[in-house]
């Protein structure tokens, strides 16, 4: 058996951490006196960088904006990050791992952080639905193959 064939696929989470966090309620306390019928916008973005041989940082940026009419009730942004060891894969498989699999791991942490921040701002509970990062990644690949060249930024 050759050495190339003996390379096994391996994946390990080394660390998950909150890299950046922000919560703003620019119209507080007046916003608390209004009827709560917000328009909620969810923005997602992912980025990855190689830290060492077979070690990558993946950052999932989640921004939630709640608006009442033209006014922003709150704006919450979390950058949830992870350091992952990924061995034995490359090319499209590696891109999928860093662009979909790792964000799937990070999203529940970001969602919990956002829910906590919104609650601490004394706004009604915010439940973010699960995100299908596999589908978003496939859409990104399709856009790339069609020559759009868009950055891997998704609005949900």
Swiss-Prot record:
HAMAP family, alphabetized: SecB
Family membership: Belongs to the SecB family.
Function summary: One of the proteins required for the normal export of preproteins out of the cell cytoplasm. It is a molecular chaperone that binds to a subset of precursor proteins, maintaining them in a translocation-competent state. It also specifically binds to its receptor SecA.
CDD domains: Translocase_SecB
GO biological process: protein folding; protein tetramerization; protein transport
Subcellular location: Cytoplasm
Organism field: Serratia proteamaculans (strain 568)
Coiled-coil segments on the chain, per record: none
Top-rank taxon: Bacteria
Name of this chain's protein: Protein-export protein SecB
InterPro entries: SecB, SecB-like_sf
Gene Ontology MF term list: unfolded protein binding
PANTHER family (UniProt xref): PROTEIN-EXPORT PROTEIN SECB, PTHR36918
Assembly with partners or alone: Homotetramer, a dimer of dimers. One homotetramer interacts with 1 SecA dimer.
Gene transcribed to yield this protein: secB
């Amino acid at each position: 058996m050759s050495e190339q064939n003996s390379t096994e696929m391996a994946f390990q989470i080394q660390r998950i951490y909150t890299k950046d966090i922000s919560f703003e309620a620019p119209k507080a306390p007046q916003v608390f006196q209004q009827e709560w019928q917000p328009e909620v916008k969810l923005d997602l973005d992912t980025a990855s960088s190689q830290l060492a041989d077979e070690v990558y940082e993946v950052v999932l940026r989640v921004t939630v904006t709640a608006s009442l009419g033209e006014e922003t009730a709150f704006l919450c942004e979390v950058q949830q990050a992870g350091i992952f060891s990924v061995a034995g894969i490359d090319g499209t498989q590696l891109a999928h791992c860093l662009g979909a699999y790792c964000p799937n791991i990070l999203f529940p942490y970001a969602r919990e952080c956002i829910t906590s921040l919104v609650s601490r701002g004394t706004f009604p509970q915010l439940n973010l639905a699960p995100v299908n990062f596999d589908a978003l990644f496939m859409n990104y690949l399709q856009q790339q193959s069609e020559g759009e060249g868009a950055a891997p930024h998704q609005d949900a």
